UniProtKB/Swiss-Prot annotation:
UniProt topological domain (Cytoplasmic) ranges: 386-460
Record keywords, A-Z: Cell membrane, Disulfide bond, Glycoprotein, Immunoglobulin domain, Membrane, Receptor, Repeat, Secreted, Signal, Transmembrane, Transmembrane helix
Ranges of residues in domain Fibronectin type-III: 109-214, 215-313
Protein name: Interleukin-6 receptor subunit alpha
Gene name, Swiss-Prot/TrEMBL: Il6ra
Sites carrying sugar chains: 32, 55, 150, 218
Annotated domain remarks: The two fibronectin type-III-like domains contained in the C-terminal part form together a cytokine-binding domain.
Amino acid sequence: MLTVGCTLLVALLAAPAVALVLGSCRALEVANGTVTSLPGATVTLICPGKEAAGNVTIHWVYSGSQNREWTTTGNTLVLRDVQLSDTGDYLCSLNDHLVGTVPLLVDVPPEEPKLSCFRKNPLVNAICEWRPSSTPSPTTKAVLFAKKINTTNGKSDFQVPCQYSQQLKSFSCQVEILEGDKVYHIVSLCVANSVGSKSSHNEAFHSLKMVQPDPPANLVVSAIPGRPRWLKVSWQHPETWDPSYYLLQFQLRYRPVWSKEFTVLLLPVAQYQCVIHDALRGVKHVVQVRGKEELDLGQWSEWSPEVTGTPWIAEPRTTPAGILWNPTQVSVEDSANHEDQYESSTEATSVLAPVQESSSMSLPTFLVAGGSLAFGLLLCVFIILRLKQKWKSEAEKESKTTSPPPPPYSLGPLKPTFLLVPLLTPHSSGSDNTVNHSCLGVRDAQSPYDNSNRDYLFPR
């Protein structure tokens, strides 16, 4: 059905211009005897009545806000360079007797209107409006010519009067559309006054596709304590949207104030708050929100007015060592949860910044630092001496192990020395292939001396 409607609309728009004329846009009619003029022109007013004919003296009086009078010979009054303020009735009299009245209307032709149509939500009528660049004259009128197109009832033409709002400085017209209607409209705005008329180009719209909400309202951006890269954003649905029947989806965009590129987030349906997790620390951000019907019906609203906000900034504090520490610059939560996602961020990552010179360091601080240094030096000296003593002991033990065996007879008591290679005693009998091993470390039970090697020293 929608395809048929689109085909019909395209056919109408492709037709000759005559077929798209929705109505006749003409200048407004004026009362008989009214003289019309453009600003800056010269106007001649003629006093009516036979009494004013000939070379008689006629007295003219302007009935407007200004008290002006003229006296002429004959029944004509010439006004040069007339302006809008000259509009009004001019009374002519002869010998203090009123002869007649001549109305003068000075007006500016209307400018060509530029029509725009919208529908705030699926439950209301469509509104077509035009905002002129200058205030129109009081006599300017506007009317909307419309053609309704659907597949069931064909075409129907109608007109809608438009009202001018001094507060909004615009002409507006309402086109009745019932809820659920799926029809096309072709509209054109005619603006006319007593000196001319202009009509807009034809505009076509679909009753559902033209739905466009107002921007979200009451946008608030606030910092979250303890979160140096978070911003909380909240808003409300526009007053012209009833969320009881139709819900809205939202888009949120934000950027640092010095950047021109926005980051855009598409939010779930009916979500009216959001937390930005990747804001730059200590930087003011610009935030905007817009809405659209939950099922993508119609168009996105305009972006809401810009609102700025800065993430939480901790108060710097001075440590006992005289160093200024700003908790905002380093956060356990920030590094654990979010820093891995934004390693390419260009913000500064400095953590500590000295704020006091060494000359201003307090005495307790100096004593603590000096004591720590002295303790460290003493510990190093102790470790070096300990290692040196250990190395010396190991060297002595190694030299004793590699020295030649002591003589068999010594003055003092001997301690047995176990050698890795046993001493060989000369063989007395047996074949050459037999080797007799002496038993190392075996002593005589009655002698305190080791005489197991006597065969080697005293051969038989």
